[in-house]
Amino acid sequence: MALLPILEFPDPRLRTKAVPVDAAEVVSPAFQTLLDDMFQTMYEAPGIGLAASQVDVHKRFMVIDVSEEKDAPQVFINPEIVTRQGEQVYQEGCLSVPGIFADVSRADAITVRYLDRQGQPQELSTDGLLAVCIQHEMDHLDGKLFVDYLSPLKREMVRKKLAKLRKHVA
């Protein structure tokens, strides 16, 4: 397994809309290795979700593990939200926008259809943190970031703060 570089805002590649994964590709050794690498990258970061777009692979899949023990890895390939209910506000962060957190309003409960790691069709109804994480990662697949939900002024403040943080690291 290998750690993958995570793209950071405002990298324009984060705005690329991902294309569907071919069902035959899902079971290939290369794709399975990529999933393993994404999980390792997510856990090391540390994070609870990682979309392929964040590691410069512009295909519609993501890995998630919202468990405290980090022992419940989930793969969502070609995810599609089929129902949304209610509304909730969560403070979100993002591995592509390190050190920044903001309140984002999302559906409280969702039902999502997707292919699992073995390429089998699944449907999951969920709420709470997992629902938020799925919606957040799916935004990445559409070239959208959680900072897009902020006002232009706040978004510019985030961009400047990240630039300042990068200067201190360099």
From Swiss-Prot:
Binds 1 Fe(2+) ion. InterPro entries: Peptide_deformylase, Peptide_deformylase_sf. Gene3D superfamilies: Peptide deformylase. Fe cation binds at residues 94, 136, 140. SUPFAM superfamilies: Peptide deformylase (SSF56420). The active site is at residue 137. Removes the formyl group from the N-terminal Met of newly synthesized proteins. Requires at least a dipeptide for an efficient rate of reaction. N-terminal L-methionine is a prerequisite for activity but the enzyme has broad specificity at other positions. This is Peptide deformylase 2. The gene is def2.
